[in-house]
Amino acid sequence: IPHDWYKIRGFDWGYSAPFGVLWGAISDGSLINIGGKHISFPRDSLIIYREYYGWTGKPNKGLKMELPEIAKNTMQMQDNEVMNKQVADPAIFDESKKNMGMTQAEELAKYGCIYERADNKRVAGWQQIRSRLTGRDGKPLIYITESCKNLIRTLPIMQYDKTKPEDLDTSLEDHLLDVLRYISMARPVTIDIKNAIPDPTRDFWDNFNPHQIRKNKKVINYE
């Protein structure tokens, strides 16, 4: 991933439930070398190229990892890579959840893992993801690398909430989807409906499977 691309890190906190961190980059449309191949992504494409997922290996079961360890591991994985924006669930800024005089956000920041409040609008966030999948000029505006195994695993199992048809069923393993939503809202796109490709997300949460994800989102290799 080129150093000069706009990069965003997103975080969703969990203790008994999984936590998730995703790293994304916004393409400027230039050619890049991936695995010895020169390819380009449409300008403004969001490439999710790294994940850190705190689960036990069982769906919706978190590692019960403390914030300092999450922060240290996150920064180690990032390895001095510079982020342009870092967004997280606004709940970590809740003053009522202070521990030893610090909010969860302040505790993370103590170990170099700094975040600002994500735009947490749920319906608008899911629409941003759908817009990126719809894309422009026949090409999607979101890509996920094969290293992001848990995002690829959990994305197709999402379902609409039966009582809130514009929202997701929050009882499902939606933690990395929330992070993807935060990142998408940090760099929103506008899609011209008249020129958009047929919407592959019309039955998005109901009918997607991993094969369709690879077809519609172009899973790519990244080392």
PLM region spans:
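Residue-level detector of short, conserved catalytic/binding motifs and their immediate flanks
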Residues: 7, 19, 84, 177
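Acidic, Mg2+-coordinating catalytic module of metal-dependent nucleases/exonucleases
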Residues: 170-196
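ATPase catalytic-site recognition across NTP-hydrolyzing enzymes
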Residues: 1-13
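Short loop/turn segments immediately following beta-strands, especially the blade-tip
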Residues: 26-31
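Short beta-strand scaffold segments in enzyme catalytic cores
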Residues: 19-25, 181
